[in-house]
Swiss-Prot record:
Residues 38-62, 90-113 bind DNA. This is Transcription factor MYB51. InterPro entries: Homeodomain-like_sf, Myb_dom, Myb_TF_plants, SANT/Myb. It comes from the Eukaryota. Disruption phenotype: Low levels of indolic glucosinolates. GO terms for molecular function: DNA-binding transcription factor activity; transcription cis-regulatory region binding. Residues 128-157, 198-219 are annotated as: Disordered. Its main location: nucleus. It comes from Arabidopsis thaliana. Residues 10-62, 63-117 form the HTH myb-type domain. GO terms for biological process: defense response by callose deposition in cell wall; defense response to bacterium; indole glucosinolate biosynthetic process; induced systemic resistance; response to bacterium; response to insect. Expressed in vegetative parts of the plant, mainly in mature rosette leaves and in trichomes. Detected in roots, but not in mature flowers or siliques. GO terms for cellular component: nucleus. Keywords: Activator, DNA-binding, Nucleus, Repeat, Transcription, Transcription regulation.
Length: 352
């Protein structure tokens, strides 16, 4: 429910300062009837004022027990202590000071006591020293500096760990690059020998196999086709590599017999794929203990087990750098496919 207003706007109520005649009418009515009934009091007392205005005029000015004059030191101390306890509840503070009104206490607090506390360095709201707050703010940068130092230390540790990881990754990628270049040269050399010899790779020094292909052709229909071969298990083993050139014979019935007889050849690059690096070792004026040659230090198994200590060797790194620089400009000539189409058919049968 909404409380009805104490005064009606259409009555033409008077506002502003009170006149002595109005004060006299209010005093005479309250002395006869006492306090209370403020909503109907103006009409009964013959005043064109609001009931609230009559109440405040009586409580703050016309009441006989109101204490006039300046506030004493005891009253100021009481106001400060009560304000610390109740805050801005002026009516509660006024009950602790007989003869003083809440409005008077509020005005005196805002115009005198509050400014005096601020000059003394006391917060008028919390009634605590203002310097305590500044001390806390001064302590904050020290804590922040400690946190910054610890974070910088952690960053240094993280950078050191990242550098170690990057070093390991760079070493691994470097060795993989070398291995890929060696494998590329070996594969190109073997493929060139296969194409040049006229047949696929068939045997090594460890095992020699003969590949025979028999094809029977009839003028009307194809009777039978059979082939058998045994490829080598390792293309890069140390030893002599054998190939099988193709020979063809025709019999009386029109059958074609294709026989691949084995022939051997030796490839220096296959027997020792790292031999071409020995020239660098011979040209360097370095002691035998500090010199690491690719042909003596690395082979098919040792290269994969190359340790990180080899990367740190200065002579080894110089030798390896020259090798890679030369390898970038090296071009291996390979016979075009269209010139060896018939031989590539045999290679496809072999690798298929």
């Amino acid at each position: 429910m909404v409380r009805t207003p104490c005064c009606k706007a259409e009555l033409g109520l008077k506002k502003g300062a009170w006149t002595p005649e109005e004060d006299q009418k209010l005093l005479s009515y309250l002395n006869r009837h006492g306090e209370g009934g403020w909503r109907t009091l103006p009409e009964k007392a013959g005043l064109k004022r609001c009931g609230k205005s009559c109440r405040l005029r009586w409580a703050n000015y016309l009441r006989p027990d109101i204490k006039r004059g300046e506030f004493t030191e005891d009253e100021e101390r009481s106001i400060i202590s009560l304000h610390a306890l109740h805050g801005n509840k002026w009516s509660a503070i006024a009950r602790g000071l007989p003869g003083r009104t809440d409005n008077e206490i509020k005005n005196y607090w805002n115009t005198h006591i509050k400014k005096r506390l601020i000059k003394k360095g006391i917060d008028p709201v919390t009634h605590k020293g203002i310097t305590s707050g500044t001390d806390k703010s001064e302590n904050l940068p020290e804590k922040q500096n400690v946190n910054l130092t610890t974070s910088d230390h952690d960053l240094d540790n993280d950078k050191a760990k990242k550098n170690n990881k990057n070093f390991g990754l760079s070493s691994a990628s470097f060795l993989n690059k070398v291995a890929n270049r060696f494998g590329k040269r070996i594969n190109q050399s073997v493929l060139s020998e296969i194409i040049g010899s006229g047949g696929p790779l068939a045997s090594t020094s460890h095992t020699t196999n003969t590949t025979t292909t028999s094809v029977s052709v009839d003028s009307e229909s194809v009777k039978s086709t059979s082939s058998s071969f045994a490829p080598t298990s390792n293309l890069l083993c140390h030893g002599t590599v054998a190939t099988t050139p193709v020979s063809s014979n025709f019999d009386v019935d029109g059958n074609v017999n294709l026989t691949c007889s084995s022939s051997t050849f030796s490839d220096s690059s296959v027997n020792n794929p790292l031999m071409y690096c020995d020239n660098f070792v011979g040209n360097n004026n370095v002691d035998d203990e500090d010199t690491i040659g690719f042909s003596t230090f690395l082979n098919d198994e040792d290269f994969m087990m190359l340790e990180e200590s080899c990367v740190e060797n200065t002579a080894f790194m110089k030798e390896l750098t020259r090798f890679l620089h030369e390898d970038e400009n090296d071009v291996v000539d390979v016979t075009p496919v269209y010139e060896r189409q018939d031989l590539f058919d045999e290679i496809d049968n072999y690798f298929g």
